[in-house]
């Protein structure tokens, strides 16, 4: 189990590392290609758009061919598209490469996490998802560092190194044993589960909402910090601190959700996210804004582990393949991340940063009010030591 956790953790680490590497480079691409906030939002949105398009195909691949082939497709595509992104010399090639990286991400995450959860005892599911997600956040932590390095060395060499890591991980995954699907579950099972299972519906929404929050933050915060005088290294440092706190917290949060249920940490995440989203538009000092951004990352990131665990709990209860469960998570995350980046950037460009942030505050408060009336239908799992 530990070896599999390390492998899956490494896969999602590399994936999120490259996803987050764009953040400190956004001001560079804005200057080089003349992108405004809307154009920067579109570039950020290409990755989750690719994940959205590949969400269902990745689940079908895991259900039909198995988790290992799904992971290998994702890692192979990541290696190719990372090199392409590093060498891109126009807006359309950047956008296309970023879109295909999102496709690769859907396959890597769906296959990797389904592989892990299928092998996990039910009482340790939250902890293992939290540990894997902690590794993913550590990748997001290191990603801005890669982006900052790329701003000095050039994107080709920096992103070429990331592609090399993907190739190494593909070789390791190929050498690791994985069970083949015992039966082929039709796509109709996913549709039926999403339509009929209230817990899956709730978990999907609680995956989409933080994606909206992070998508908006990923565009507006770096550009605002740049306006206040900070360069790529400073922006990267802010996200480094934020992701470090998230990475340390995710496994603890997973264990807490195993012990006490999925809803208490989700309610806390909603309340804290509403507060920081309310505060984000106002700081006029870079250091103060940096502190609020760190708090925002911690609050927004507190959704992922309990929300994903809620979806996998419901999948097990309804007999849904885990590959389909994580396909649903991808389908929920992708439009949120893309919508937050593209719509948040466009709305802020047309009005001000306050409008998208305050709209998200209202969404968090409305969801919290609804969740206060929601009751879990299953008792908390007994956490295994």
Feature locations, PLM:
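Conserved MFS/SLC helix-loop-helix module at the cytosolic interface between two early adjacent transmembrane helices
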Residues: 53-89, 257-263
């Amino acid at each position: 189990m530990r070896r599999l956790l390390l492998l899956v953790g490494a896969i999602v680490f590399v994936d999120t590392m490259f996803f987050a590497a764009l953040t400190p480079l956004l001001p560079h691409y804005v200057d080089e290609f003349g992108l405004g906030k809307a154009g920067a939002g579109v570039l950020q949105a290409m990755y989750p758009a690719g994940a959205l398009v590949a969400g269902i195909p990745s689940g079908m691949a895991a259900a039909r061919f198995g988790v290992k082939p799904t992971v290998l497709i994702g890692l192979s595509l990541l290696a190719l598209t990372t090199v392409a992104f590093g060498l891109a010399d126009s807006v359309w090639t950047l956008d296309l490469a970023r879109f295909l990286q999102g496709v690769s991400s859907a396959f890597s995450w769906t296959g990797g996490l389904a592989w892990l959860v299928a092998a996990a005892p039910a009482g340790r599911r939250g902890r293992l998802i939290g540990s894997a997600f902690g590794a993913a956040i550590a990748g997001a932590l290191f990603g801005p560092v890669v982006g900052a390095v790329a701003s000095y060395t050039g994107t080709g060499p920096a992103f070429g190194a990331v592609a090399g890591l993907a190739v190494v991980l593909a070789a390791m995954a190929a050498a690791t044993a994985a069970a083949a699907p015992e039966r082929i579950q039709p796509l109709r099972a996913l549709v039926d589960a999403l339509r009929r299972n209230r817990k899956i519906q709730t978990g999907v929404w609680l995956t989409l909402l933080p994606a909206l929050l992070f998508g908006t933050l990923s565009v507006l915060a770096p550009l605002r910090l740049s306006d206040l005088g900070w360069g790529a290294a400073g922006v990267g440092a802010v996200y480094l601190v934020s992701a470090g706190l998230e990475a340390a917290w995710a496994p603890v949060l997973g264990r807490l959700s195993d012990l006490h249920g999925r809803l208490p940490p989700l309610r806390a995440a909603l309340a804290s996210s509403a507060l920081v989203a309310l505060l984000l538009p106002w700081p006029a000092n870079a250091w103060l804004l940096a502190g609020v951004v760190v708090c925002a990352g911690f609050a927004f990131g507190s959704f992922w582990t309990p929300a994903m665990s809620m979806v996998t709990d419901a999948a097990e209860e309804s007999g849904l393949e885990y590959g389909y469960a994580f396909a649903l998570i991808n389908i929920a995350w992708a439009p949120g991340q893309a919508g937050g980046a593209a719509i948040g950037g466009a709305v802020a460009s047309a009005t001000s940063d306050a409008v998208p942030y305050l709209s998200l505050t209202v969404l968090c408060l409305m969801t919290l009010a609804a969740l206060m009336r929601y009751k879990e239908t299953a008792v908390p799992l007994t956490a295994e030591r």
